Structure formats: C-alpha cells, structure tokens
C-alpha cells in the first residue's frame, strides 16, 4: 500500500545530525569525501538528483563509513520511489553506527512496510520505540504501523480465497477503467474511463455496457447530457438503474461543465433516466455539498440515504464518510458523520452501501491493516449502530492501495480496479468471489412492470412496498414512464405488501412472502395491470387480513385500508360496494355470515376514517362467487378475499 512516507531526512535533518557532532565536524575526516558530500548538498537543494547521487557515491567511495552521504542517498532514492535502494542505504547507516540517529530506524521501517517487508519493519519500529525521547507524532505513527505489521504477519499466515478474473474486453481497454457501478439485476454496468490523449492526461467519462447472454457488450459513452469536456467520476447507480449519482470537480474557469454549477472543489451531482435516455444533471445541493471535497457517492437501494466521502471541516481525519437522508419533500438532510467507529484520523474513501442497506464497504488507511489503504466491511444493527470494521483479508488487501470495491446484489461477487499483470492495459476492472465472512445479508430483487390492463400501455405509476411485520414503508418511488418498469432490492426474510396508484386508475395491491420462496437465488417478478376507473371495476384488497374464521381486522390491514381511504377521498363522488368472499370449506350459512361480517368490518373502518356512509354498501357472498375452482389449497386461498367494486363515479 503505497503511501506518503515520513522522510524527515531533509537537508535540515542532515544539518541537525551534524550539529550533534563536535563543531565543524562530520562523521568523516576525509576532506575529499566531505567536499563531495557538500557538493551533493548543493545539487540536492537545486533538485538535481542525478548530480547529487554522483557526488554522494564519490563521497562514499572516499569514505565508506561516512554516514551523512548514506542518509541523503536514502532520501533521494525514496523520493524517486526506488524503495529497495533507499532501504539498503539506511541499513548501511545502521551497520556503521546504529546509535547515530534514532530516526533512521523510523524511516527505514516506513519504507519496509510500504513494500510488505513486515517482519523487518516490525523489528525496526520496535527498535525506534525503545528510545525514551521521541517526537509524539512519530511515536503515534510508529505504534500504529507496528500494529499494522503484527496484523499483516498474521493475515499472511491465514489468507482468504482470492482469484480475480478480468471482466473482459467489452468493458476493459488499453486505457484506465475504474470506479464500477452495476444495477441490482446484474444487467447494466457503468464505469469511468480515462480517455487520455497525447496532450490531455486526464479526461474522465462514463461508459455503459449491457449484458447479453451472460456477456458484457462493448461499452459506449453514456451520452453528452452527462459527459462533458471536463471530468466526471465515481459513478453510482440506483438499484433499478434509473438514477445516477456522480462527482464533478471545479474547472479552471470555475464551472463544473456546461450548465453545471457547484459550491467549490468537487461536488456531487445526479441525473435521472427519461425512457432510455439520461436527463440533465443537477447539483445535489448545498445541504450536502460544501466548498470542500465531496465525492464517491453511494445511494441506498431504498432510495432514502446517500453515503459519500468529504474532506469538510469538523471530521475525524483527512476524509470521512457521511450520510444524508432524503426527506418527504425531496430535499437532502444535513449530512451526518458515521462516527469514530468508521472514520479515523486517517483517510476513509470509496464507500459502498450494499443493497441490503446494512453492509458498508469502504477503504481506509486509519484502521489496523496491511499498512495503507485497505478494504473493510462494517454492519449496521437494528438500532442503526455500526459494528467495528473488519479487514476483509489478505491477499485481497496488500501493501499496495486497495479501494473502489463494489459488491453485487447477490453478495457473492466483488468488483475492483487493478493494474495487475495480464490485463488489457492500464487499470482494468476485475471481479472475484467475496469471502463468506465479508458477504452482506441475502437479498433478492423484486422487478415489476406496470401497465394499463386494457391497452397494455406502460404507466409511470407510483408504488410503495411495505414490510407487513412492521407496517413501515420500505421504499416509495415511481415506475419508469417509458416502459412501466421498476426494480427494488429486498431482504428475503420478510413478507411485503405492494401498493400501486395512478390517477384515473383503481389502485392495485398485492402481497408476497419472500420468506417462502423456494429458490431464493432467483428474482421475484410481477406484472401490475392497472384497471381504469369505470363502473363495475373491482379492486381486490389483497393486503386486508383477518384472523382465521374471524372478522377482526389484523393490524397489518391498516396500511391498505388507509390507501383505500385516500383513494376515496381523492375520488369524492365515487360510490362502491365492499364484498366478502370465502372458499367452500365448512358450513355455507356460517361462511355467508363470516363474509358479511368481514365486509362490514372494512365498511366500518372507512366510515370511521371520514368516508360518507352514503357512498358505501357492504355484502357477504360466502362461497357463491369464486374466482377459480375450489379444487386446491392455492385456489381456495384465492377465493378467500375482500373486494371493493365501483358502483358509481
């Protein structure tokens, strides 16, 4: 994990080392060696490293035990990322005189941990920490990295499975591809590509690919409405692929691209799909964006939370992870810092909230890990509290920087970018099987298609999914008006009610039990035919529930009945009949009475909640009007129902 090294051996340090000796003396008395070293200092101050190294080699040749040239040579090598050569020079210094300067152990250990030499780094950090007078900042850094060494040594002994596969040339090219985003149904893949040229080093744009027969097709630019001559990055798609969040940074002229305005530095923007095309992009707003760095958004699958990374004032470190909530009026709340369990005095970035809504993946160099930016997973409990983050393990995490992880809705696959050998060029996007311990909760996606029951024309209807156990709304949104489709992610251990409404149509209700799915790996698909409001039209109240053989309304019926109240309140002149129906099991007379009482229970609820009794009637039909034959348990269940029929508009 490459990181900025704390190399304190600047010219100032060298002079301070000299000051520890008798006045006017170096660690050498060889005049030619001293002259060569002082020439090297002059070249070093002029940033002429090659001439400085030549003079340093000359000084060392004249006196191999001359410490100062070794120290300056180590710094030059380190600054030019010739890490092993820098390490060799520090080791030579310690061989000459291990007590010359305690900082030599510190700087050597920093280099060793940066290339994964954990045992060597551990030894040198321990040697450094034995000194009693240490700069507090250096001591804190050494103690943290010593903990990293201890963690890494054990992690390497206990590796997790890791076999990354290149995602293919439909997405990857000889350029850099990174920051992947994917829809919950695994059919649309969006990512960032740096379309650099000979004259432009950074030109970031978004590309999109569709999966056909299990293969990602050749990616194409997402369109001029989003991509600009500037840079767009860190994309994130809503679960259904209808909303795109991304970051854009301020250009030299102060803009964020054509017709885009911001608050300073990098801001978050969003765009919505209109049919098959993307609409105009908009700034998320001043509640979220500041004049500091905001980037790397992750939109929760329920459409209620936006996680992102910010360098704003008041955080715990260089960059922290925040979350903002979407209010009922469509505005974003003031962001909340995720707190010290997640954020550290270091850097947190590349946040991703899984569609299960409870599992958070992110990169950090502040938690104990392999030495720099590692990938971590944290989980939210039922109280909304985050667990301690867990490092997802070696060799997924290494001494290099790891970030930008994306986890599929199924939870078994993770995507990341790497410039590892064997790719198509530059950074490529790879996927791998996520270790079981790092996987999120099991979910499936629910995909619906809303249309006019007569014409089959798609409808952009409003829909809401409700947890039947808690009565709480899980997600509320609109279907795509172009194709009538919607897609949401849902935990499989719950049962849900679906309510769909559209002006001019009867509202639609359904309930389904994901707990009872035979194959939990497959999505739940549903057609939603909407009936135009006409006399004789019928709504089956599928989310009105009674105790067995009783007419007491269950508490979970309230949501549906309130929808019916709202529907009748909007359609002020509508009149209707509430009807109860049973199957053919049991005494016919008792069934007739039961159905009558159940219809009346719904009637009473509506009247109690403000609907004029003159607009309503109720009747029980027993088993006289079955929808299907009473020849199976499933069919008998369909015949046990409560309906609302329009008898006048």
PLM features: what roles do these ranges have?
Residues 364, 368-371, 571, 577-649:
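Periplasmic OmpA-like peptidoglycan-binding domain that tethers envelope proteins to the cell wall
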Residues 469-485:
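Short, acidic Ser/Thr/Gly-rich low-complexity loop/linker segments typical of extracellular
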Residues 29-62:
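Alpha-helical segment of the N-proximal tetratricopeptide repeat
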Residues 503-527:
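Structured interaction patches on ligand/partner-binding surfaces of diverse proteins
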Residues 484, 494-504:
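A short, solvent-exposed beta-strand micro-motif common in secreted/extracellular proteins
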Residues 28, 34, 72, 79, ...:
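Short, conserved micro-motifs composed of acidic
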């Amino acid at each position: 994990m490459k990181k900025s090294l704390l190399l304190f051996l600047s010219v100032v340090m060298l002079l301070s080392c000299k000051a520890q000796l008798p006045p006017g003396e170096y660690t050498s008395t060889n005049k030619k060696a001293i002259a060569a070293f002082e020439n090297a200092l002059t070249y070093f101050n002029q940033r002429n490293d090659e001439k400085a190294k030549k003079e340093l080699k000359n000084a060392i040749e004249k006196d191999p035990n001359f410490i100062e040239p070794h120290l300056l040579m180590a710094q030059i090598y380190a600054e030019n990322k010739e890490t092993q050569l820098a390490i060799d020079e520090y080791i030579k210094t310690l061989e000459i005189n291990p007590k010359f300067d305690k900082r030599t152990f510190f700087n050597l250990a920093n280099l060793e941990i940066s290339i994964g030499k954990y045992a060597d780094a551990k030894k040198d950090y321990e040697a450094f920490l034995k000194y009693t007078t240490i700069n507090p900042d250096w001591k804190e850094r050494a103690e943290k990295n010593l903990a990293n060494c201890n963690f890494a040594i054990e992690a390497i002994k206990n590796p997790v499975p890791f076999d990354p596969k290149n995602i293919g040339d439909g997405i990857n090219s000889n350029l850099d591809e990174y920051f992947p985003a994917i829809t919950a149904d695994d059919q649309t893949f969006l990512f960032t590509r740096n379309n650099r040229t000979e004259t432009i080093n950074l030109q970031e744009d978004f590309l999109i690919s569709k999966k056909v027969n299990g293969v990602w097709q050749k990616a194409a630019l997402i369109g001029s409405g989003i991509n600009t001559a500037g840079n767009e990055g860190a994309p994130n798609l809503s679960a259904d692929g209808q909303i795109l969040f991304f970051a854009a940074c301020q250009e030299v002229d102060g803009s964020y691209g054509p017709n885009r305005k911001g608050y300073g530095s990098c801001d978050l923007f969003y765009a919505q799909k209109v049919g098959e095309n993307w609409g105009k992009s908009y700034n998320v707003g001043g509640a979220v964006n500041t004049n500091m760095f905001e980037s790397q958004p992750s939109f929760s699958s329920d459409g209620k939370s936006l996680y992102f990374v910010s360098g704003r004032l008041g955080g715990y470190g260089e960059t922290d992870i925040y979350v903002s909530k979407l209010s009922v009026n469509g505005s974003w709340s003031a962001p909340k810092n995720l707190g010290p369990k997640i954020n550290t005095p270091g850097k947190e970035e590349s946040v991703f909230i899984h569609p299960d809504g409870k599992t958070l993946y992110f990169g950090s160099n502040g938690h104990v890990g392999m030495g720099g930016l590692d990938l971590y997973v944290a989980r939210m409990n039922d109280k909304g509290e985050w667990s301690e983050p867990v490092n997802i393990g070696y060799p997924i995490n290494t001494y290099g920087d790891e970030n930008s992880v994306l986890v599929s809705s199924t939870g078994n696959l993770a995507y990341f970018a790497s410039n590892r050998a064997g790719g198509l060029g530059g950074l490529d996007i790879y996927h791998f099987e996520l270790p079981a311990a790092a996987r999120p909760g099991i979910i499936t996606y629910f995909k619906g298609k809303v249309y006019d029951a007569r014409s089959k024309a798609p409808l952009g209807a409003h829909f809401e999914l409700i947890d039947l156990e808690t009565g709480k709304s899980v997600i509320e949104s609109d279907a795509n008006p172009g194709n009538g489709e919607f897609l949401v992610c849902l935990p499989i251990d719950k049962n849900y009610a679906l309510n769909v409404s559209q002006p001019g149509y009867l509202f639609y209700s359904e309930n389904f039990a994901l707990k009872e799915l035979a194959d939990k790996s497959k999505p739940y698909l549903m057609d939603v035919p909407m009936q135009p409001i006409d006399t004789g039209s019928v709504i089956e109240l599928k989310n009105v529930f009674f105790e067995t053989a009783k007419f007491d309304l269950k508490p979970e019926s309230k949501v549906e009945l309130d929808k019916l109240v709202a529907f009748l309140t909007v359609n002020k002149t509508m009149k209707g009949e509430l009807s109860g129906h049973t199957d053919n099991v049991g005494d016919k007379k008792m069934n007739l009475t039961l159905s009558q009482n159940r219809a009346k229970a719904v009637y009473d609820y509506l009247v109690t909640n403000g609907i004029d009794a003159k607009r309503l009637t109720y009747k029980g039909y027993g088993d006289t009007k079955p929808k299907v034959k009473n020849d199976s348990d499933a069919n008998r269940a369909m015949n046990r129902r409560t309906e609302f029929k329009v008898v006048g508009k």
